[in-house]
């Protein structure tokens, strides 16, 4: 029977943690994705557990059959969770009726949220809280067994929670949805209820004991005084408080190191409770041999502080270790579990030792507090209840007071000192020698002094977001740390929900990071930030009222405000710190924070719309674009798009920013299909390489020729797109048209009514949030939209232009020689319609009302298409043609993503081989050297080097540059034999490249030491 009960308790812990994970998804819909919402969920959850510990701990001491009560608890949990999706929807709708018109996160709004949260999960969580004291009452027969058996039950329940963390974080939510997940695992509790009820009928023993029986079972048990017990209860509450301070700080810090994907948070929780589980198991095995449990409790608290201190110096090395892990793992789908295991290693380094000793504290405190077998339920229940209340207060104080005011580092130091303080207090109530008490007190004083002097978090270093780096780029930790010197930290603010930083590069480029993830900048992001604000205004006939979700750098909001026809802008930003940081971007965002047109709302934008159904807008813009980050994917669901649609005026437009990088075709298809379920008509634009802007409406979108051309003639408008620091911003009518990838008609064919064969992303079926991190890990780009843009189909642009924009735009890339081929293909109906390109109207009797967009825009995909289509005949490789071709290939390989494409472009290398074969002097062409270096082609570089002596008339500067490529290549692939073979022929003084000089000094230095 006992084995079956242990199995039931294990499964109960698993189901409980799955419920917690699933409830967090419900609460995000209900309360918004804010730190207040997370705090309310934790408070309600832990409050319910504490209440259950206390109520059922008292109640179980008065009943004859604890196992039957346990079965009723499991029945209650199962029924409540099975019905949860039904009554959640009722309360969800009721909340938005009652809270209508309120501002999110004001005092009244938060009180309402707390009230409704209590109604949603207080019943099942209270029942969950009762399971441990009730099961303990049934399992424990002797008072001497309390600590050991509580430790075992705690271990089993926690191991179940570990399994629940993995199931909830990786498997069920995106495959079953949150409603079905809830109902499915409710059957686990119902099954446990059935099994334990059946077993309870076989129990004949009366668990209400007489005083005589109780005294027999308590013989030989060490008695602690009332004062000692009160101190232990007080200290276990403080210990619970400190444990949650650590967890909150670790979660914030580790998110900066391993990223903010939903799986990353599951791994952090997995590691935290694994340490607790192992600690509780070890104390379960040891507790029977201990003579003084109060002393053991004090030592555990002392060791928590010591182990946190021990791992402090490692925290700043964790990004370096994770870079090593991420740099050696191949970026394929099949290796994603290995990458996640790498995250576990990082989290274990940070958390395991302290959580191991945290796991010992509750069994020890329960053992001390339970002084009578007849009051066993009260003893265990009160211990767990007080500890859980400490958890509740600790999570709230850490998230809302400590992090925003004193930051991660000081919060951790406060936790260490509190653990030391707990240990000192407990030691003074033990019978140990006073010299030991003095030593422990002295250690507290030393800790205070040491912690006040030692700084273990380097702000510039920790905020860099190294989890995005896909290759190892430093050979040592010291070299890795120096990379931070490339940027200067100009803003650092820890808030309730995130760490927000702004850095400035040597060139003056500002970058905004949220939890380490670059979110906006005055560099590469500018084209998309600017056009995100412009594009809706250009396509709407009378855009007076605009709602913008997301501040970022403030550039989009500032650009919007420059349009005279735009009268009112409401800008919702969830992070107060991001709003503050936008002040640093005032030169680029037109001082948006102080623009009278702009109303800044510090709230969850989606919740704000839901609470204000009466508000209508001409344009709504949604800027967040990284669905792999936890919480952001809520802005890419059918229900969110429907909410947006309800807030659009007639002929209103919705602009959504999405990226085609760090994703895959499946995710992009799901996203567009989800969008198409709500918005039947849309245009897709690409203002920058792999950044997409989708403009949707429930009515056909008309491109007004006169309005667009008039805008481009407006000096004020032109001043916003002609940025002296960013030459790549589309700033002409031609470039505006070239941004368009998919027009209205083609969009309708592919996505306009939602393809039934494709999945959609829903609030209660969040596919993207769970699949996007895998695509982010692989790090590829999706070209599905570009492929659709290239399909053999011409489409009409509503007669936007009636005469050619650029008669022969191929001249921009030296492609004149294949113009005739393209034209003849068009005439034969083999349309080459674009990824992104300049629009022009073909001659040769083509319909002049249609604009054909072809592959002639100078970006990666256009070059790739040109290289693939370049003819391989011998007469295509004249010297001049080869030089042009090699120049195009070099530009292509200089792209950050070109290596991915090169594996699919064998023609590229064959073109170079053919040119070199026909023109041997190309062995000394530095562009060829650069191409082979970029692609890491050792054999090709060696071949060039071997033939270099045969070349005459080489400019010495070019020769040095070519050798530099070979030196760096050998060094990067760690071919030191090849590098040493070059040394006798190299005069270091001739090289100007700092990296090459450093390499040569390092290698020659190693040679001398050898």
Question: Which residues does each predicted region cover?
Answer:
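Alpha-helical repeat scaffolds
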Residues: 834-841, 848-854, 860-878, 885, ...
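TPR repeat positional signature
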Residues: 818, 882-885, 892, 925, ...
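Structural register within alpha-helical repeat arrays
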Residues: 837, 881, 885-888, 928, ...
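Alpha-helical transmembrane segments of multi-pass membrane proteins
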Residues: 1-711
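SAM/dcSAM-binding transferase cores
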Residues: 705-814
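Residues that mark the junctions of alpha-helical repeat units in TPR/alpha-solenoid scaffolds
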Residues: 878-881, 885, 921, 959
